[in-house]
């Protein structure tokens, strides 16, 4: 996702290395930090396990490309899957179950798919190239 945005912000074409339907769990960095701090602050008595999954959303590569082109209408994004990289993505789960974290220490992400891109990633990457 960041590579797509960086290329779009620089008016460069981007060839995505996975299929459009490739899906992976995703979260904004502020939510990752929030999860670490939330787990560290949780009362030990509330924790039912030592390891927790946390997630926010699971977009496909096509979902990400659509979001990027909605913000950068001249973006040129194509899909040219590379077998080795596609196999890595295919070996990962498309979604992560974070229900135990939600139950034990009230985990919930602040950033939705749209907010991650429109309020966090895209503005920060645009600002980087505006310098």
List PLM regions with ranges:
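Oxidoreductase cofactor-interface core, primarily capturing Rossmann-like NAD(P)-dependent enzymes
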Residues: 1-15, 25-26
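C-terminal substrate-binding subdomain of Rossmann-fold SDR/epimerase-dehydratase oxidoreductases
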Residues: 17-20, 25-131
């Amino acid at each position: 996702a960041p590579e797509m945005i960086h290329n779009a912000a620089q008016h460069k074409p981007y060839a995505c290395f996975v299929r459009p339907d490739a899906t992976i769990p995703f979260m904004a960095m502020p939510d990752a930090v929030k999860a670490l701090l939330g787990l560290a602050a949780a009362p030990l008595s509330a924790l039912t396990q030592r390891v927790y999954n946390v997630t926010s959303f699971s977009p496909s590569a096509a979902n990400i490309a659509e979001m990027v082109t909605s913000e950068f209408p001249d973006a040129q994004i194509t899909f040219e899957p590379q077998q080795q990289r596609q196999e890595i993505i295919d070996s990962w789960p498309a979604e992560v179950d974070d229900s135990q974290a939600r139950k034990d220490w009230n985990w919930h992400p602040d950033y939705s798919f749209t907010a991650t891109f429109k309020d966090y990633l895209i503005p920060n990457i645009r600002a980087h190239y505006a310098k």
